[in-house]
Amino acid sequence: AVSDLPALRRGYLTFGCNQNLQKITDELLGLWADIMRAVPHSRLRIQAPQLVSEESVSSLRMRLSTLGIALDRVEFALPAARGEYLAGLSEVDFLLDTFPFPGGTTTCEALWMGVPTLTLSGVTLLARQGDSILTVAGLSDWVARDGKEYVAKAVEFSRSPERLQMLRRKLREQVRQSPLFDAERFATGFAQTLWALWRRSLAAKAPQ
């Protein structure tokens, strides 16, 4: 079930990231540090398969500390079975996406649980995956175009817990009605796009 926004009962924002640790670059950590400095008392919850390794945890702790994120504001969550993993999304107010390799399945699962993801769009097909998912889900305002906007949007959303709560309560139904979760509608639209591209290709090759 979709939970209420945790910030309403805690009094502070909890950002989350459920991506593979290899996706978490120093540049990204620098932006997270900027966000947490701008949002007092906020916390960061990181869940990743690699956190079962003490070596991985130690390495990540060192990087976080070096880049300006206080370790007492960070929670490390171990990988979990699917049901427990989805339930764990009730612990975060919204997710901070990685870049240039954003989430895919993790973003969709979070949307289903009422949790939006803030993503940073890039120039390659893969780097625009988060942008594509969120735009189709009706959340284009959760797409940043550069690091500065990524930080600014995170701070802006953090200052409006009531808005986040309203979004959380309606998000599952919103995405359920979008092409993202409507397989037949998605397939129809995809097929129409392919046919349109085919006709365009034929027209370009036709004798003038």
Please describe what each predicted stretch is.
Residues 81-92, 112:
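Short acidic alpha-helix that forms the nucleotide-activated donor recognition element
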Residues 94, 98-183:
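Catalytic binding pocket for nucleotide-activated donors in carbohydrate/polymer assembly enzymes
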Residues 71-81, 99:
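Active-site donor-binding acidic/aromatic loop of nucleotide-activated sugar
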Residues 1-15, 23, 27, 37:
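Nucleotide-sugar donor-binding and catalytic loop/hinge architecture
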